[in-house]
Amino acid sequence: VGCPVGCIFCESGRNGFVRNLTSSEIVQQIILLRRKVNRIVFMGMGEPLFNYDNLIKAIHILRDRYGLNFPTDGITISTVGPVDQLKKLREEHLKIQLTISLHAATQSARNRIIPHMRIYAIEDVVKQALSYSERHNRKIVFAYLLLPGINDRPSDVRQLAKWFRGKKVMINVLQYNPTSNSRIKAPQKREIVAFKHQLEQAGLEVTMRVSHGREINAACGQVAKT
């Protein structure tokens, strides 16, 4: 409930952090849907890896044939990448999908975008994510919310290419969903398309995520504790 990370584009941490969910509360969210679920993504509000033990226990229950018997390939953890927890996750025999909320190509830009994660060097986050990919033979998705004037420079493209060209990586360029932070300038769609093209020209695999739920303030970055 709430979030301690403090991304500048996200409402989830606006009113602070209250507590982590228990493993049973996590699993119950799937059960309460009362319909066929073919994909589970741990994201929305909060940092999953800061609730590591309950998260891993919930995933084991979801995967267990006496639990929900959910396929491993259908489970994704979306994380800002706390390095110690990424190292632990690498050693788990889960082989789940991993998305890293990177949002920057330099330490200074990431410190600005995700200020409460400045204790983790961006190079270490990238290194551990790629190590997970190599160990488990999984393509890693790096989420990149485009913020004009902050993370959209040609040097950012070059750095991303230096890290990820030739790796099992996909860059997911995200659109900013409006929040109460009036200081953020949302990019035009043409700017997002142009940045995507620059990344592709640099030899990277890139996609653009279509955001759902914006009309009810339930899209990525808009979910807040009330």
Q: What are the residue ranges of the model-derived segments?
A:
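Conserved Radical SAM active-site core
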Residues: 1-96, 106-108, 131
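Conserved radical SAM core fold
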Residues: 46-49, 68, 82-86, 95-119, ...
